[in-house]
């Protein structure tokens, strides 16, 4: 498998294997990695990861595990056994849960995926947090959870690009994965806190998750190439 040097992760947010592979077959694994989320994984199970890896892609398994420490750690181990490049868990599961995942990966005898923490979903604003009992700005909650992730030894965080500068300043070791990326002129859809790819990298993001601007483009390969060119 050729190592991808691009920061772009294309979201394969599809309900079927056929639809996901139809897009993947138009993409160059040297120009992007791919993300398998809940819908596709639930539909296709682990086989979709194997197929994508056989096509040369590094896979971000975006299942956002959140359970008691042992259960979550065993799920992360199962992801590592699949050969995924990156896996994520919810930071709100707490320090012990994240630390258990870290310890399990350290003991894993094989390539270790990047272990990424999910802070605050990019669709959530202050009123959404208030609705679940958190009277706090999203950025404050992100910083609170980031400190737990750092303490637990996580490799990085999922965060919006607006949070990236503060996170890089406070936790320069952590790699930042940013969804809600829309090239200039794209619709915002359901991601509220968004920036363009260039703005996100300049803000401190390390990896950019891009879905509909590529997957729904008339020519996905051309759309991907245009973003790569924009990033220089």
Swiss-Prot record:
Q: Which Pfam families match?
A: OMPdecase (PF00215)
Matching InterPro entries, A to Z? Aldolase_TIM, OMPdecase, OMPdecase_AS, OMPdecase_bac, OMPdeCOase_dom, RibuloseP-bd_barrel
State the EC number(s): 4.1.1.23
- Give the active-site positions: 64 (proton donor)
Return the GO cellular component terms, semicolon-separated: cytosol
Q: Tell me what reaction this enzyme catalyses.
A: orotidine 5'-phosphate + H(+) = UMP + CO2
Coiled-coil annotated residue ranges, if any: none
- Give the domain of life: Bacteria
GO molecular function per UniProt? orotidine-5'-phosphate decarboxylase activity
| Keyword terms of this UniProt record | Decarboxylase, Lyase, Pyrimidine biosynthesis
Family designation = Belongs to the OMP decarboxylase family. Type 1 subfamily.
Which NCBIfam families does the record match to this protein? PRK00230.1 (NF001273), pyrF (TIGR01740)
Q: How does it assemble?
A: Homodimer.
The record describes the protein's role as: Catalyzes the decarboxylation of orotidine 5'-monophosphate (OMP) to uridine 5'-monophosphate (UMP).
Name of the protein described by the UniProt record: Orotidine 5'-phosphate decarboxylase
Q: Which organism is it from?
A: Pseudomonas paraeruginosa (strain DSM 24068 / PA7)
């Amino acid at each position: 498998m050729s190592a991808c040097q691009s920061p772009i992760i294309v979201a394969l947010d599809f309900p079927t294997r056929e639809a996901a592979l139809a897009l993947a077959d138009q993409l160059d694994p040297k120009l992007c990695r791919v993300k398998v989320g809940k819908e596709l994984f639930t539909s296709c199970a682990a086989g979709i990861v194997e197929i994508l890896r056989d096509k040369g892609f590094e896979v971000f398994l975006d299942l956002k595990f959140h359970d008691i420490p042992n259960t979550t750690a065993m799920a992360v181990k199962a992801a590592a056994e699949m050969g995924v490049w990156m896996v994520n868990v919810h930071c709100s599961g707490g320090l012990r849960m994240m630390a258990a995942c870290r310890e399990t990966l350290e003991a894993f005898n094989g390539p270790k995926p990047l272990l990424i923490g999910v802070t605050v979903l990019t669709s959530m604003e202050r009123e959404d947090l208030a609705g679940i009992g958190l009277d706090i700005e999203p950025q404050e909650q992100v910083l609170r959870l980031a400190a737990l992730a750092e303490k637990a030894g996580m490799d990085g965080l999922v965060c919006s690009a607006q949070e990236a500068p503060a996170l890089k300043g406070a936790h320069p070791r952590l790699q930042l994965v940013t969804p809600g990326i829309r090239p200039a002129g794209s619709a915002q859809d359901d991601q509220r806190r968004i920036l363009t790819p260039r703005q996100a990298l300049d803000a401190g993001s390390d990896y950019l998750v891009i879905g509909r601007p590529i997957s729904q483009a008339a020519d996905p390969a051309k759309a991907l190439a245009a973003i790569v060119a924009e990033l220089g």
